[in-house]
């Protein structure tokens, strides 16, 4: 059993290096690795020396980061679910997204931001759950404090988000800090915006103590909000992302259009306009929209007109099982029948050109 696995791990770095574009965050592939920490650290291609050092030194943190990859990729797919590019991932590509992120587009800006945020979230959560040797609950949240409602005692387990941010910065930014080009600066900016987004939704939760809930004493702690809050916030930043160009000395950005404001540390920035993602394009990494489900009654990005890029759509009748004739029974249950429902599903037609199906 061990011999075949050893052979796979021996060839994996060479295979992935050959298949993968240069511009990518190689640590994203950690979601697909398993086994010992040494196997994981040594067989994720593209990690720089600082990342490998941290990987070997903190295998428990790496496991948390690897589990977090699935969470932030799911969040990315949720946010883009109604768009032509839907944050689709490629199983045999350690960049996860293929060539689409080679372009310094607003989609790249979002992915780097949400992935950086995902690392902060995953590490901080693992700290609070006692899964990491190097951190625990926030040690600064002790003693008595005061807010608008009066005095309270710090108690429970406050999320140690400062540790999550510090480790995420050291690990995620390590590769970009080795580069001095424009794309590295863009990635660093968006990585930071993602980290700041998680901390933005840190909230204070309290529990009252006293006779009949009189709240004569309050115990409070700081907790991260659900990751969806961060995803929604970064989605708004994606829609308001600011196109920039490098300044003359190559140390920072200036807005491409002087009518727009200078980006803040919370904004997402990008250099290049996005492709339309209408057709499968090997160079752009676009899978196209042929076969994508569209909404016939929508006027948004998921409408058949927009999603299908004017190519039209096919309609098929499908049946699905739904709950129907639900009744409330005392006490206290709702009982339903299983019913078959017929509905029309609309999918985008393929382009008429013969080369639309060229593999990406």
UniProtKB/Swiss-Prot annotation:
CDD domains assigned to the protein according to its UniProt record, in alphabetical order: Wnt_Wnt2 (cd19345)
Residues that carry a glycan: 295
InterPro entries found in the cross-reference section: Wnt, Wnt2, Wnt_C, Wnt_CS
Keyword Signal part of the UniProt annotation: yes
Residues of the signal peptide: 1-25
Disulphide bond pairs: 76-87, 127-135, 137-157, 206-220, 208-215, 278-309, 294-304, 308-348, 324-339, 326-336, 331-332
Lipid moiety-binding residues (O-palmitoleoyl serine): 212
UniProt modification remark: Palmitoleoylation is required for efficient binding to frizzled receptors. Depalmitoleoylation leads to Wnt signaling pathway inhibition.
GO MF: cytokine activity; frizzled binding
Entries under PANTHER family matching the protein: PROTEIN WNT-2, WNT RELATED
Protein name: Protein Wnt-2
């Amino acid at each position: 059993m061990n011999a075949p696995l050893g052979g796979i791990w021996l060839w994996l770095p060479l295979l992935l290096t050959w298949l993968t574009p240069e511009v990518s965050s190689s640590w994203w592939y950690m979601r697909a690795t398993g086994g010992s920490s040494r196997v994981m650290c040594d067989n994720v291609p593209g990690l720089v020396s600082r990342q490998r050092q941290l990987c070997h030194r903190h295998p428990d943190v790496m496991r948390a980061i690897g589990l977090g990859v699935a969470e932030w990729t799911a969040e990315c797919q949720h946010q883009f679910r109604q768009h032509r590019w839907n944050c689709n991932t490629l199983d045999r590509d350690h960049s996860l997204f293929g060539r689409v992120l080679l372009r310094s587009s607003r989609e790249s800006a979002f992915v780097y931001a949400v992935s950086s945020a995902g690392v902060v979230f995953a590490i901080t959560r693992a700290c609070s759950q006692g899964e990491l040797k190097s951190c625990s609950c926030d040690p600064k949240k002790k003693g008595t404090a005061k807010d608008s409602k009066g005095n309270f005692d710090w108690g429970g387990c406050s999320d140690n988000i400062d540790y999550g941010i510090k480790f995420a910065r050291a690990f995620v930014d390590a590769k970009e800090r080795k580069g001095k080009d424009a794309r590295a600066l863009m990635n660093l900016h968006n990585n930071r915006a993602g980290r700041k987004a998680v901390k933005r939704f840190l909230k204070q939760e309290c529990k009252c103590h006293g006779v009949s809930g009189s709240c004569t004493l309050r115990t409070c702690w700081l907790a991260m909000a659900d990751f969806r809050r961060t995803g929604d916030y970064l989605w708004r930043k994606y829609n308001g992302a600011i196109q920039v160009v490098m300044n003359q000395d190559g140390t920072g950005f200036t807005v491409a259009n002087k009518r727009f404001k200078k980006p803040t540390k919370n904004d997402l920035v990008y250099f290049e306009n996005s492709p339309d993602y209408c057709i499968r394009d090997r160079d752009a990494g676009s899978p196209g929209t042929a076969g994508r489900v569209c909404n016939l009654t929508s006027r948004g990005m998921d409408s058949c007109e927009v999603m299908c890029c004017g190519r039209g759509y096919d309609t098929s009748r499908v049946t699905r099982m739904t709950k129907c004739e639900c009744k409330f029974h005392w006490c206290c249950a709702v009982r339903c029948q299983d019913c078959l429902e017929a509905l029309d599903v609309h999918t985008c037609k393929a382009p008429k050109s013969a080369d639309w199906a060229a593999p990406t």
